[in-house]
Amino acid sequence: MQRLIEGLQKFREGYFSSHRDLFEQLSHGQHPRILFICCSDSRVDPNLITQSEVGDLFVIRNAGNIIPPYGAANGGEGAAMEYALVALEINQIIVCGHSHCGAMKGLLKLNSLQEKLPLVYDWLKHTEATRRLVLDNYSHLEGEDLIEVAVAENILTQLKNLQTYPAIHSRLHRGDLSLHGWIYRIEEGEVLAYDGVLHDFVAPQSRINALEPEDEYAPHPNSPLISYDAFKVPGKERPGREKATESPAPQLSPLPGFGHLPREQAERIYRGSR
């Protein structure tokens, strides 16, 4: 605590003093252009990894960067998203998971949490779709490899869950909003972004040259909205598989989870999206 109190003084005398104009501007209101949804993990700092300024990001943090499907929970996530979209007119949403995620480790052994961590157990049940998908389709993996897959699949699950919210679904239909999935790899200081055409997590820096300076916060035409199934494990190439050289038009699924969930489960979880 002493270190934090000393930090308060250093902040005021250092950073605040040299950025008075910024804080004067922020005192009159906020105008973030990005909604950043990430994990509560202390190793993840959105402003640090993006090198963004105070006021650039509107942040939602919770264990596992989870967004329950519309109507499934009465937590603050839905309210925060509604405020971001309606009041702040944000047009970009990033869901950012990270390597070595404790929430994903817990998700893979969910039943063992029920007695000792009942609130965590109840929370992680909101991403049962991720757990079932990983256990059913990646039985050949274990340890950190399995956790790595869970982190990636969970990001895609949350992108689908976002689409079950009417305000988001409507804006996506109009082309007024983009969704992005990121993985922050702590040990490498690297961020990978999901590419809906390649079905892979790739370095987002490869897209920078395609953006005009004035469009840096505009909805991105390659936003991963639909084709989430069959992604490649980050950093691992699948034998005999080549990356696409062209960008085919995305094919809409009847339901957000239709690509890799049983239809009955997809309807139960995502029926609010249509």
UniProtKB/Swiss-Prot annotation:
Enzyme class: lyase
InterPro entries: Beta_CA_cladeB, Carbonic_anhydrase, Carbonic_anhydrase_CS, Carbonic_anhydrase_sf
Cofactor section: Zn(2+)
GO MF annotation: an example: carbonate dehydratase activity
UniProt keyword annotations, A-Z: Bacterial microcompartment, Carbon dioxide fixation, Carboxysome, Lyase, Metal-binding, Photosynthesis, Zinc
Cofactor: record remark: Binds 1 zinc ion per monomer, a water molecule forms the fourth ligand.
Disruption phenotype: Cells do not grow in normal air but do grow on 5% CO(2), called a high-CO(2) requiring phenotype, HCR; even at high CO(2) levels photosynthesis is less effective. Carboxyomes appear wild-type and contain RuBisCO but no longer have a HCO(3)- to CO(2) interconversion activity. Light-dependent CO(2) transport into the cell is unchanged.
GO biological process: carbon fixation; carbon utilization; photosynthesis
Residue ranges with Basic and acidic residues bias: 234-245, 261-274
Enzyme Commission identifier(s): 4.2.1.1
Catalysed transformations (reactions): hydrogencarbonate + H(+) = CO2 + H2O
Described function: Reversible hydration of carbon dioxide. Essential to photosynthetic carbon dioxide fixation, supplies CO(2) to RuBisCO (ribulose bisphosphate carboxylase, rbcL-rbcS) in the carboxysome.
Record protein name field: Carbonic anhydrase
